[in-house]
Every structure is written in C-alpha cells, then in structure tokens.
UniProtKB/Swiss-Prot annotation:
It is found in: Plastid, Chloroplast. The lineage of its organism: Eukaryota, Viridiplantae, Streptophyta, Embryophyta, Tracheophyta. GO terms for molecular function: RNA binding. Usually encoded in the trnK tRNA gene intron. Probably assists in splicing its own and other chloroplast group II introns. Belongs to the intron maturase 2 family. MatK subfamily. It comes from the Eukaryota. This is Maturase K.
Length: 511
C-alpha cells in the first residue's frame, strides 16, 4: 500500500503532485493485489457464483497495452469481424482483460479516500464499509425520513449520449493525463455506446460483460450529476425535524421544544428554516432515483424542470420531461428495489387523563410501508419454469437428472434467498405463497424424476424430505439488525433489514 500511495500523494520536494495512475499499470504487484482482491472480497450469501474466471490473468493486461502502442497499422484481418486489426485476436476477450485491470487501478484513489474517511471516525459507532454496500442499507434511510414528506419525483437517470462525456467526468478525479488518454483510446477502439447499454427503454440494463469497468464509469457520471444536490441541500436546510412517532412520548416532545428555544436564542432565521424548509430527501439505486420533499406540487414542478435543464446543459443530453414523474406519497406506491413502497396513515389511540376526567385521542401517524410485489415475483418464477403465469406450480424438467439432495438444495436456496431479501416486508403473506409454489414445484420435480405422482412420492419418502422449506426463513436470523425489538415475537413480525446483501441472483439463471 505504501508503494501505491507514493504515486498518489504530493511530493514534498516539488510543487507538483504525483497523482499518477498510469505507472501502476506496469507494476507487477498491482496485479497480485487485484488477484487477492478478487478472491478475498466479502460475498453476500445471495451471491453463490462470484463470476471469477480462473482463466483470467491480470498479467496479460500489461502485454496487451504494450502491443496496443506497438501496433502495425498496415496489418488487416479480414477473416473474423470480431477481431481487432492491430491485435489480430478476439476483440471482446482483450477488451474484458484490459477493462478489468484498468478498473482495479483507477479505483485505488477512491479506496484510499474511503479508508481515510472511515479512520476519522475512530471511537464512534459506524457501520463497516462493506455494510454500506448492502442493498438493504437504503431502506432504513427511507424509513426514517419519508414519513415527513408529501411529494416525490420518480426519476430515470439518463445515460450519456457520447463516450467522451465519461472521460471528461473523470478529469476531476484522475489528474493523470496519460491514464485519461489510455481510457479515451480504449473506449473508442473497443466499444461503442450500444455495447454498454443493452436496452434504451425505460429502466435500461447494462451489458453483462466488463461490468466492473463500466459501473465505475457510470457511477462517476452519476456522482457528477448528483453533485448539485449536495450544494442545494446545504443551502436550503439547517435543522432536521424529529420523527413523528417520537412526538407521542413526552420526553422527546420536551427535548424538541428545548432545541427550538436554543436555536431561537442563537439565530431567529434558523428557527424560520425549521418551518419553511422544504426538506429534500434523495436516494438512488442503479438507474432510478427518488427526490422527495415536503413542499408543494408547484415546488416539485420547479425541481423537475431544473433537473431537465441541468442535464441538458451540463451533459448535452436531450432529456424528455416524461422521464420524471411527480407523485403524491399518500396516493401512490413506488416500485423501488423490488419492493412496493408507500406512505400510509397508521391510526394510533392515546389515552390522556386530566384530574378526574379521562379521554381518548385518535392520531393518524404516517408510516413507511413496504410490500412484496406478487405479480412480478410470479412472473419471474414462471420465466424460470417453476410455475405457470397464473401461479400454478409445475415441475422443473431440466433438474430431473440431479440427485434428490441437489434438487432440494436448489429449491431451498432460492426460497431462503427470497425470504432473506424480502425480510423487510410489512406483510409476509405473499412470501408464504411463493414458498408454497416452490415447495410444490420441488415435489413435482422429484416425483417426475422417480416416475410417480406427488402423493405417492411423498407417502413413500416422508414429509420430512422437504423439511428444509419449513425452516427457511428462520435460518437467516443471525445477521445485523439496524433496529432492535422489545421482544422476540416482535423480531419475527417486524421488518428486518440485513447488511450483507450486495446482489441477488435472477431466478432465470438457475438452469
């Protein structure tokens, strides 16, 4: 690590800063570190196949870059359209090798910055860096703030129309001109925009090849587009409000009143901000983002046109206003990260007594609600041939050649993964329906293998053969809980967000 920092830290003997990534491309130990990074990376229990290719070698990247600069411009290959003229070899294979090596090297400054920022919190309770990568870490962030807000902007982030925009975005982070020239040469030589984005429809997906390299470029581009929110958020907000649920208890109520008096005594203008501040709340996952506010519809409409003009002017994008939708939180549900999220009123009754008179007060408290979308889940199961489009379980013929234990293990793994990911659902009834479909599909697959009916097979083998499905949701209750519950029964009934979910496999991949 000291060798790496030597290229990235300023030199005390000169006025220039090293900050050079290009020399690292030709250092032997970099590829050894990259290899160890790929093997020792923390994996989610949902990520069964890391996708690490044992035939891949980072040492080849050095030789490829050398050949790129020693190319013969008079050499032409006419036999294979997928071969690069100056390499004479498979173009997609070499592009993957170079992109993976370059992606690891260009991530080094960001990793060092993350380590230094986390080290500054010594003595304080913070989540570990790998927990911050969890998909579920976003939901407590939504849960704590969305109950205060009124309107939300559903935004589909536009993709860059030209590869040069990606290179220009990195100029603010990578000061090494040689690395930028190599990146520009590599992008224009190997790729076009169509190879990066597989679909230009709303909710587009990215190419499955060279994912690490492209995600780094895309995240840099999105970070640049989101940088304006940081500035505007700091300009418009000075004091956060307290959760509505906390106001039911008097100790928190008096605490908030004391805070108001303290702020009022110091700065009267800040007290006005508490009541007039629209309180923006922004969150993003992949290509979809949400901007919520407690302002009016007119304010949200202004934000909509501001974002359109911002993307058009800064990134030369023709961004249609139809990609941004204004919805009221109390009337609409949002399909976000596999959940149907909404804000609903939760009635609460409080008993109050003054002297000899007692009376009841009905309060409506806003609550962030998360539901499991049953129709998309059944569609995924039908696509993977576990059931029909109507949700009727069917057998999985392609697994009939496996052993009984392997068949049960595969079905049980899918069931556990679904229960693990959707543990934050407010209502678990949908999950038990999915569990029933998978359990019956497993039984029919086993019966098909043994050439018998489901009833005959279960009677001969015993119901304990599928016992794994009965305990699938209890086997994952050993991880981090952001919220503690007062009782064990409350843990099983409440929403649970886990901090080890980095990705979830598509059911269609189980062939």
């Amino acid at each position: 690590m000291e060798e790496i920092q030597r290229y990235l830290q300023p030199d005390s003997s000169s006025s220039q800063q090293h900050n050079f990534l290009y020399p690292l491309i030709f250092q032997e130990y970099i590829y050894a570190l990259a290899h160890d990074h790929g093997l020792n990376r923390n994996r989610s229990i949902l990520l069964e196949n890391p996708g690490y290719n044992n035939k891949f070698s980072f040492l080849i990247v050095k030789r490829l870059i050398t050949r790129m600069y020693q190319q013969n411009h008079f050499r032409i290959s006419t036999n294979d359209s997928n071969k690069n003229p100056f390499l004479g070899c498979n173009k997609s294979l070499y592009s993957q090798m170079i992109s993976e090596g370059f992606a690891f090297i260009v991530e080094i400054p960001f990793s060092l910055r993350l380590i230094s920022s986390l080290s500054s919190f010594e003595g304080k309770k913070i989540f570990k860096s790998h927990n911050l990568r969890s998909i579920h870490s976003t939901f407590p962030f939504l849960e704590d703030n969305f109950a205060h807000l009124n309107y939300v902007l559903d935004i589909l982030i536009p993709y860059p129309v030209h590869l040069e925009i990606l290179v220009q975005t990195l100029r603010y982070w990578v000061k090494d001109a040689s690395s930028l020239h190599l990146l520009r040469f590599f992008l224009h030589e190997y790729w076009n925009l169509n190879s990066l984005i597989t679909s230009k429809k709303p909710g587009y997906s990215f190419s499955k090849t060279n994912q690490r390299f492209f995600f780094f470029l895309y995240n840099s581009y999105v970070y640049e587009s989101e940088s304006t929110f940081v500035f505007l958020r700091n300009q418009s907000s000075h004091l956060r409000s307290t959760s509505f649920g906390a106001l039911l208890e008097r100790i928190y109520f008096y605490g908030k009143i004391e805070r108001l008096v303290e702020v009022f005594a110091k700065d009267f203008q800040v007290t006005l901000w508490l009541f007039k501040d629209p309180f923006m709340h922004y969150v993003r996952y992949q290509g979809k983002s949400i901007l919520a506010s407690k302002g009016t519809f007119l304010l949200m409409n202004k934000w909509k046109f501001y974002l359109v003009n911002f993307w058009q002017c800064n990134f030369s994008l023709c961004f249609p206003t139809g990609r941004i939708h204004i919805n009221q939180l109390s009337n609409h549900s949002r399909d976000f990260m596999g959940y149907l999220s909404s804000v609903r009123l939760n009635p609460s009754m409080v008993r109050s007594q003054m002297l000899e008179n007692a009376f009841l007060i009905n309060n409506g408290i806003k609550k962030f609600d998360t539901l499991v979308p049953i129709i998309p889940l059944i569609g995924s199961l039908a696509k993977a041939n576990f059931c029909t489009v109507l949700g009727h379980p069917i057998s999985k013929p392609v697994w009939s050649d496996l052993s009984d234990s392997d068949i049960i293990d595969r079905f049980g793994r899918i069931c556990r993964n679904l229960f693990h990911y959707y543990s934050g659902s407010s209502k678990k009834k949908t999950l038990y329906r999915i569990k029933y479909i998978l359990r019956l599909s497993c039984a029919r697959t086993l019966a098909r293998k043994h050439k018998s009916t489901v009833r005959t097979f279960l009677k001969r083998s015993g119901s304990e053969l599928l016992e794994e499905f009965l305990t699938s949701e209890e086997q994952v209750l050993s991880l981090t809980f952001p919220r503690a519950s007062s009782s064990l029964w409350g843990v099983y009934r409440s929403r649970i967000w886990y901090l080890d979910i980095f990705c979830i496999n598509d059911l269609a991949n189980y062939q």
